[in-house]
């Protein structure tokens, strides 16, 4: 049984955020130098430890990566070391199995400049790249718009296609060729990788040139080099579309109970989507199958040792039984240390006795009583992380204008109706606040539950017009009735009233109910609202205060579980609802007229409201696209401001509200489809999300602190001096004298392997096989080039000695040719 040796334990840093990498060499873990992080050999296996800082704690991910040409023994050792490292971390890590070519986005995200897969491995003498070494000849196929994966391919035009980016790496020169159908982001990622190779692997001693496939005529010297090295070019292959995963597949969840009775894996289906946390019992192990795309194994803290230690094996056996591809991703989750990705596959994930620090949306029936803190706008912008958690840009004391949708147009709401929201109406509310001398805007779009579809559509349309009037600066916040965020409530200072239906417009012919019942929630002027409920005794709740308005009087009913602050706020909002004298009624001492107004006594909720466990919320960022006619969201892990690209739109999900960020160069269709895109995201979310979750539309350059607070070290000036693609291209290759470099590369004196390199090229004399095999330089016949022994063989002897024809041998990568020559005694 392999074990973490003392050297590994001694060098293992488990307190500093970042990554550490080991390669499996002779069944031992050997550290990989940090200067070569992101470079992997396909003949090897690796173990990667990633440490993340989350608030005041650290979280751990352990990945073992399997190269396609690695041995079974190496794969087994990597898996065992991963389990043992998790044990060393006391079960606090999430384990991941990564297979070459099907790496998880989490794994790729660690290597911001790109993941490079090289041919060879430790068994063939391949070492991780040494800085300043220019003895390299390879062609890298660069894939990916976000997290780049670059793999070595045959050095020939046959490897190219019109849609991707390729790096021809000749040691002292790197030529980046951009397919004519590749996009700007793919080209920029390729340039970043080329720059990384130049600066990190070559110590800055390599020239980099860029060729745009649609304008090859602009780079004649670079094209001459490429044609010399790669041979004559035929018609290029068409672009290869990136594989996409349908949202429906991600949402196809099945939970299985796993037991290992009598040495046999027994799997029993427990549930399908929607999944709830209470399905997971601490005494058991489970497999969660996400549509065959990824397999999660959950290990209960009280499960038996054999089942816990065999979790990864159970997953691999499950994959075989289901006939899923061997490259299927696997994550092993420890009870109590689950990853955010795993948690959000469930409808709700809570952790007892943990404070999340996130305010909750106030809704009828289930409302978290969160104490709001009063902040001014300047403080919120200086401390955006507080603004993000409290969902407050300021204390609500800015200027406000309110319009109602009437006949599909905007009509200002009279001052006496400010703070009154009717379920039959839609409203636009423009809030203006100052940071220094600069004005900032929030545009709330409030949509009543009984408003017509035409009015709802008109509210969205009018919001666009109002947004344009203010130069696209307002942050748009869509609010469905009952989901009012804290900041909206703070604007009305404890006097916000939401009616079930009806309207406040003039000439309204609908009869106004003579008796109305309102449930009041809130503890101060910044978080209180009264929400109309059905005027029946069954609507009461012992934990709250209710206002009962009748033709003759107004009752203030105080449940036994309400607080003094709640009673005081109810008195304040009651003055907004009724000007008559308020009669305070204590639960259990109601007069007969009170019950008569409600249609008689009836049972109602009177059990003590339990202390709500705080839901674990981890913000998640997604790049969104609907260009293919269907919605696609690609998650960005360990995100920061640099991940927000000007050409794209992004979705920031903080669970009880969703931000939609629009880059200034995003296409118009994606801008228009903001609300639809977020709705589609919520519909296809595996956790069965609330479709009425507030949606906040944010434009680049006008981000509120409630958005920027989710990003570490947000720079408001980041986009003020951005360079164009042409500027970056010129900057990358502005030091190259291409004429001189072309002469050097194409000179016969320079040993550059090309697609036309022939084993029979040059006037080399032929010798019998026995005079060349296993001979030292001193024992070779006169006239033999020691570095090209195989080229002195006849075609027949060559095929017999090396097991292949000269043409087949010449098509192999250089490293593989060298290995074969060593094996056959011709090195």
UniProtKB/Swiss-Prot annotation:
Transmembrane segments: none
Annotated keywords: Actin capping, Actin-binding, Apoptosis, Calcium, Cell projection, Cytoplasm, Cytoskeleton, Metal-binding, Phosphoprotein, Repeat
Matches recorded under InterPro entries: ADF-H/Gelsolin-like_dom_sf, Gelsolin-like_dom, Gelsolin-like_dom_sf, Villin/Gelsolin, Villin_headpiece, Villin_headpiece_dom_sf
Gelsolin-like repeats: 27-76, 148-188, 265-309, 407-457, 528-568, 631-672
GO cellular component, one term: cytoplasm
Residue(s) carrying Phosphoserine: 366, 735, 776
Tissues and organs where the protein is expressed, per its UniProt entry: Expressed in small intestin, colon, kidney and enterocytes (at protein level).
Region: LPA/PIP2-binding site 3, residue numbers: 816-824
Region: LPA/PIP2-binding site 1, residue numbers: 112-119
Disruption phenotype: Mice are viable and fertile. The ultrastructure of the intestinal brush border is normal. Show increase epithelial cell apoptosis and are more sensitive to extran sodium sulfate-induced colitis. Newborn mice inoculated with S.flexneri are not susceptible to infection; cell invasion and intestinal inflammation were not observed, even though bacteria were seen in large number in the intestinal lumen, close to the intestinal epithelial cells (IEC) brush border.
Primary role: Epithelial cell-specific Ca(2+)-regulated actin-modifying protein that modulates the reorganization of microvillar actin filaments. Plays a role in the actin nucleation, actin filament bundle assembly, actin filament capping and severing. Binds phosphatidylinositol 4,5-bisphosphate (PIP2) and lysophosphatidic acid (LPA); binds LPA with higher affinity than PIP2. Binding to LPA increases its phosphorylation by SRC and inhibits all actin-modifying activities. Binding to PIP2 inhibits actin-capping and -severing activities but enhances actin-bundling activity.
Name used for this protein in its record: Villin-1
Organism: Mus musculus
